[in-house]
Amino acid sequence: MSVKSLFAGAVGVAVLVMPVIASSASAETSSAAAAKTVCVSTSGAPQFRQYIIAGLGKWNESVRNVQLKECAGATLRYVEGSYGQQGSHAVTNGHGQGTIYIDYQQMAKYDKVRITAHETGHALGLKDHYQGPCSELMSGGGAGTSCHNASPNAQERQSIERMWANGYTAPETWSIQQ
């Protein structure tokens, strides 16, 4: 086999492989482009902004289909205050809209980033699971004051990825018409 034939063959293989590489890069780009952005406002919780940002970061590094960031037109707001028995909680539709209330007393007692990440989990569509271990972010305060895990576990990540796969839309409602 001549060097010329070998070179021509190598160029031919490269030309055939390049569209595959470009195609897979394009798929990654479109997947990333499909991520829904939830705009948040931390202006109502200035004392805890750094912990809120860190909690958002835990979600952003864990999931691809939704990303949270501070931007104009916020649909998710964080406020701080004393909320008594309710403590920190979220009033949300689970679709990235609502208000997260950060309680002073709980922030003094529990891991601050865990609280903000946990409450953000509600805004993304997850429910509480207080009986869960510390490794479950949505076990919340049920895991005790010694728990410092602020990252969603594999099951929580998969749930969010599934729910936000095409942007999170309202759940389907079925009715039988007669």
Predicted regions located by residue number:
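Active-site recognition of the HExxH zinc-binding catalytic motif
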Residues: 59, 114-128
